[in-house]
């Protein structure tokens, strides 16, 4: 019996990757990179939307209250007066120049007409004109000054519109040691 001889061959070199495989692998890297970037963008957008949504509902303390109209009782409590041309041409009224005209209907006041002079700013209007305005808004049509007192959200203290600025809020709440920043969600 003869033994078959087996020739030992050297191991063949590993096959070289084809150009098609290299192109497919680089395409896969590009696709995965694009998907990762898209995922990061969606996560960032979701975080911004969530922050804006939460801030909208939690920052109510610092945002100004909506300019709602005055109630009937407050409207009736505003002083009425009768216009006279002799009074309007003297003193500070003559310096302003606009106290003889209603800024809403743009007509001059006539002698004996009933007018309202707003207490905080001193602007004058026909009673009918300003009453229609103040039913839907609580500010002066000329200077936009709020006519109703603003209540503090923390303690309920009523203040005039001039005191609503940031400095007053800090002075009013000096006793409060904890301040919650509104920029945090």
From Swiss-Prot:
Transmembrane segments: 29-49
Membrane topology field: Single-pass membrane protein
Catalytic activity: S-ubiquitinyl-[E2 ubiquitin-conjugating enzyme]-L-cysteine + [acceptor protein]-L-lysine = [E2 ubiquitin-conjugating enzyme]-L-cysteine + N(6)-ubiquitinyl-[acceptor protein]-L-lysine
Subcellular location, record wording: Membrane
EC number: 2.3.2.27
PTM statement from Swiss-Prot or TrEMBL: Auto-monoubiquitination.
Region (Disordered): 163-185
Principal cellular location given in the protein's record: membrane
Polar residues composition-biased segments: 176-185
InterPro entries, per database record: RING-type_E3_ligase_ATL, Znf_RING, Znf_RING/FYVE/PHD
Zinc fingers classed as RING-type: ranges: 102-144
One cellular component (GO) term of this entry: membrane
GO molecular function per UniProt: ubiquitin protein ligase activity; zinc ion binding
A single GO BP: protein monoubiquitination
Pathway assigned to this chain's UniProt record: Protein modification; protein ubiquitination
Keywords from the named record: Membrane, Metal-binding, Transferase, Transmembrane, Transmembrane helix, Ubl conjugation, Ubl conjugation pathway, Zinc, Zinc-finger
Tissue distribution of the protein: Expressed in stems, flowers and green siliques.
Subunit structure: Interacts with BIK1.
Family: Belongs to the RING-type zinc finger family. ATL subfamily.
Notes on the domains: The RING-type zinc finger domain mediates binding to an E2 ubiquitin-conjugating enzyme.
Record function comment: E3 ubiquitin-protein ligase that possess E3 ubiquitin ligase activity in vitro and mediates protein monoubiquitination. Triggers the monoubiquitination of phosphorylated BIK1 in response to pathogen-associated molecular pattern (PAMP) detection.
Name the UniProt record assigns to this protein: Probable E3 ubiquitin-protein ligase ATL44
Organism: Arabidopsis thaliana (Mouse-ear cress)
Gene: ATL44
């Amino acid at each position: 019996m003869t033994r078959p001889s087996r020739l030992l061959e050297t191991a063949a070199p590993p096959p070289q990757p084809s150009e098609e495989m290299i192109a497919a692998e680089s395409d896969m890297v590009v696709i995965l990179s694009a998907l990762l970037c898209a995922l990061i963008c969606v996560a960032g957008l979701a975080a911004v939307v969530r922050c804006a949504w939460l801030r909208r509902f939690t920052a109510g303390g610092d945002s100004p209250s909506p300019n709602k109209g005055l109630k009937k009782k407050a409207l009736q409590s505003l002083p009425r007066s009768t216009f006279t041309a002799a009074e309007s041409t003297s003193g500070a009224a003559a310096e302003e120049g606009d106290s003889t005209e209603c800024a809403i209907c743009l007509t001059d006041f006539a002698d004996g007409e009933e007018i309202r002079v707003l207490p905080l700013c001193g602007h004058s209007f026909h009673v009918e004109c300003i009453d229609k305005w103040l039913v839907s808004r609580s500010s002066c049509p000329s200077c936009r000054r709020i006519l109703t007192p603003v209540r503090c959200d923390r303690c309920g203290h009523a203040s005039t519109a001039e005191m609503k600025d940031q400095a007053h809020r800090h002075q009013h709440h000096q006793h409060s040691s904890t301040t919650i920043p509104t920029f945090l969600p």
